[in-house]
């Protein structure tokens, strides 16, 4: 595991890029805190329609790694993976829009909160409803991929690796047990990670993991640090169709990656502060370094 970043870099016979798009909520109303993470149904419909009109090839998040490694696909058309984090209840509205455009997506699910509320958020957002297990089963049956977003929605870069690993393992086990589907990919809650966090996720048995980085995923990327492009409410359909095609100069991409790494490194000082929604208390570990799950939203399954 020590050289995972070097040994397992994505390789392919020819460079390839995939635009992994990151969404959170598709709704008409939003709080100030969630405004940039909320796209109205009308805007989402416009965006997906524009991608379809531009000839985009819609793929699942679990397919991205194989495509970057050279699995066959038409390289003349943009490759797009729509991802939706957190499984808010309005994901059902997003799924209906996707179906109208014959498009698929991947929903990253924080399993502790399924059928409950988004308790990791603050203020009134903590009352946002999360899709239930029957809702997720319906999405599965409609061709939407369900993937892992951690159990408690904790940050991979602010918690001990043992906590991150057990949290991700439990999430994967619940999804596979309750929905009967293989779960091979993961999205980091809050988007951040570090080397120890990446190793923890790899140790669970995932094939790939997604962050943010505001870049296309490309041949040569670390499979456990695949970037995504955040799509906000101010992005028109035409602009999004342009975004998935644009090729930034390599020096610009390197600068953006360096900026995100620097910001991520600065987050480590938060480990010294009190527990937050991103970082759990040390006493959550038992004597064997495993994460305790009592005393919170949990259905008692694996």
Positions of predicted regions on the chain:
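C-terminal domain-boundary segment and adjacent tail
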Residues: 38-74, 176-178, 193, 203-223, ...
């Amino acid at each position: 595991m020590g050289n995972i970043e070097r040994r397992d870099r994505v390789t392919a016979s020819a460079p390839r890029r995939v635009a992994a798009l990151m969404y959170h909520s598709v709704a008409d109303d939003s709080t100030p805190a969630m405004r940039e993470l909320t796209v109205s149904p009308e805007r989402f419909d416009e965006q997906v329609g524009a991608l379809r009109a531009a000839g985009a090839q819609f793929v699942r998040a679990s397919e991205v790694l194989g495509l970057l490694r050279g699995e066959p696909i038409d390289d003349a058309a943009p490759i797009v993976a729509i991802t939706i984090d957190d499984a808010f209840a309005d994901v059902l509205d997003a799924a209906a829009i996707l179906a109208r455009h014959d498009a698929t997506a991947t929903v990253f699910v924080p399993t502790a909160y399924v059928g409950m509320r988004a308790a990791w958020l603050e203020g009134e957002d903590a009352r946002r409803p999360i899709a239930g297990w029957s809702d997720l089963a319906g999405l599965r049956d409609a061709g939407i991929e369900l993937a892992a977003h951690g159990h408690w929605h904790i940050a991979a870069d602010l918690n001990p690796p043992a906590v991150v690993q057990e949290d991700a393992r439990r999430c994967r086990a619940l999804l596979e047990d309750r929905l009967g589907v293989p779960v091979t990919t993961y999205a980091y809650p809050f988007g951040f990670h570090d080397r120890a966090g990446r190793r923890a996720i790899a140790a669970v048995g995932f094939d790939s993991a997604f962050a943010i980085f505001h870049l296309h995923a490309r041949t040569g990327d670390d499979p456990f640090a695949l970037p995504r492009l955040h799509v906000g409410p101010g992005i028109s359909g035409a602009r999004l169709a342009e975004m998935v095609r644009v090729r930034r100069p390599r020096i610009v991409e390197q600068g953006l990656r360096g900026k995100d790494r620097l910001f991520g490194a600065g987050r480590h000082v938060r480990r010294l502060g009190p527990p937050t929604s991103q970082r759990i208390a040390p006493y959550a570990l038992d004597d064997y370094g495993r994460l305790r799950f009592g005393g919170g939203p949990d259905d008692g399954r694996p």
